[in-house]
Design a protein with these regions (language model features):
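Conserved SAM-binding strand-loop segment of SAM-dependent methyltransferases
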Residues: 75-87
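Core SAM-dependent methyltransferase catalytic element
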Residues: 168-196
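Conserved class I S-adenosyl-L-methionine
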Residues: 1-33, 35-44
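Conserved SAM/SAH-binding beta-strand->alpha-helix loop
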Residues: 65-67
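Conserved beta-strand signature within the Rossmann-like core of class I S-adenosyl-L-methionine
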Residues: 120-131
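Conserved SAM-binding motif I beta-strand of class I
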Residues: 58-63
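A short acidic, Gly/Pro-enriched loop at the edge of an enzyme's catalytic core
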Residues: 90-97
Length: 196
């Protein structure tokens, strides 16, 4: 990611209060993991890392923002690290649970899958394109397309939960979102499975 991205997120985290309540998808499904080694991709200020640590996970919390990562230093069972996702190398077959919310970088899908142990759980939630969205990123490449999660993951994951739904924020703005909980099957996926 460019220096511009890092600066943008540093400013956002300095000047805007971050949500502190974990999304329901994570509180509902994280406990399905059979192990306790977790990865929080693009963790932001760490609401999900903190939740996972509170229920017994050891969490690698990754983000491009120094502000975000510094806020997580010293919290038991959270191991924050500032990374550039354009160049970061994920460990192979390392995590029992990987979560990612409101960050879409399709090139990471095969890397995330390789980092997940066989039988590991991937929990993902982000914005979905819809022409009537009132509060979503304006850059279409930052939005999933309808049916994209199922098309991308169905052939090598056991999809345990999949939904595309309208959500309303605190100001009443409506936005389409997509959510998935999937269990990595034996054999996993490689770059070729993602069209890379």
């Amino acid at each position: 990611m460019a220096l511009k991205d890092k600066q943008k997120w540093d400013e956002k985290y300095k000047n805007n209060p971050a949500p502190d309540k974990p999304v329901k998808l994570i509180t509902d499904f994280a406990k399905l993991s059979s192990g306790t080694k977790a990865l929080d991709v693009a963790c932001g200020m760490g609401r999900h890392s903190k939740y996972l640590a509170s229920i017994g996970f050891d969490v690698d919390a990754l983000d491009i923002s120094y502000v975000a990562i510094d806020s997580l230093q010293g919290i038991p069972h959270i191991y924050p690290k500032k990374v550039d996702f354009d160049t970061y190398t994920f460990p192979i077959d390392h995590y029992d649970l990987i979560i990612c919310t409101y960050f879409l970088k399709r090139e990471l899908f095969p890397k995330i899958t390789e980092a997940l142990k066989e039988g590991g759980i991937f929990i993902y939630e982000t914005f979905l394109y819809h022409p009537d969205n009132e509060n979503a990123p304006s850059n279409r490449s930052f939005l999933l397309e309808e049916g994209e999660l199922e098309l991308t993951f169905d052939h090598k994951y056991e999809i345990m939960h999949l939904s595309e739904y309208w959500d309303e924020d605190q100001q009443g703005a409506k936005t389409m979102k997509a959510a998935m909980v999937a269990k990595k099957k034996s054999g996993g996926m490689g770059d070729e499975d993602f069209g890379a």
